[in-house]
Regions:
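N-terminal extension/subdomain marker
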Residues: 1-214
Length: 214
């Protein structure tokens, strides 16, 4: 990890009282935060709300945004239907690697576990956090009649300390897996978004800017 990102990570750990000394886990929380905070009000969620838990397979963070609110339970899905009579949904999936290179096997694994997630089958070997998120997603699709403008959108963020170069092999892996996800007929759109080291630094700094008046 370069010295600039190291400094940002140290500040994040201090500011959010991250209570693990494991730098890999710290970076997972950091990646989850910068992705979600740049798409959703950072003051309206806690780091634990978007973590898939310790040693969850293949996916480090998931944010389920329903009607512009972060949803953290099945009951909140039901409440959103009750009070809004609609479901506008966006799934944000996050996987982070502290390494300085984008690896095809890791990206493939991220997609594989994302596809497994959307089989909607909780498993006792998964973390409680991941099982809870699977149940939330299942509740969303059970109530598909409330989709208002479109089916849910899926965005997959892969965060790494390397440099993104549009590598042909990686691009092939990504494109093939996107097609497989699209063929599930669950999503309005599927998008893969790489965060390389420069993007990580830029997006972290954006989280520190004052919120502009709307």
């Amino acid at each position: 990890m370069d010295i600039v990102t190291e400094g940002y990570l140290e500040e994040f750990v201090q500011n959010f009282s991250v209570n693990t000394k494991d730098i890999t886990k710290q970076f997972e929380y950091f990646a989850n935060f910068i992705v979600v905070a740049n798409l959703y009000d950072a003051n309206r969620f806690q780091i634990k709300d978007i973590s898939t838990g310790k040693n969850a397979p293949g996916i480090d963070g998931i944010a389920i945004i329903i009607n512009n609110r972060l949803c953290t339970s099945v009951e909140e899905v039901k409440d959103s239907i009750k009070y809004n009579n609609k479901l506008d949904v966006e799934f944000l999936f996050i996987q982070s690697k502290i390494s300085s290179k984008f690896e095809g096997n890791d990206i493939e694994g991220f997609f594989r576990w994302t596809k497994i997630f959307f089989n909607f089958e909780p498993n006792k070997v998964y973390t409680s956090e991941l099982n809870n998120l699977i149940c939330i997603a299942k509740e969303v699709y059970k109530n598909s009649r409330y989709f208002s403008r479109y089916q849910p959108k899926l965005k997959l963020f892969y965060v790494c300390n390397g440099k993104w170069t549009e590598d042909v092999i990686l691009k092939t892996i990504i494109d093939e897996n996107i097609v497989e996800l699209e063929n599930k007929n669950l999503f309005e759109s599927v998008e893969f978004i790489p965060y390389d080291v420069k993007k990580v630094q830029k997006m972290y700094l954006k989280t520190k800017l004052p919120v502009e008046a709307s």
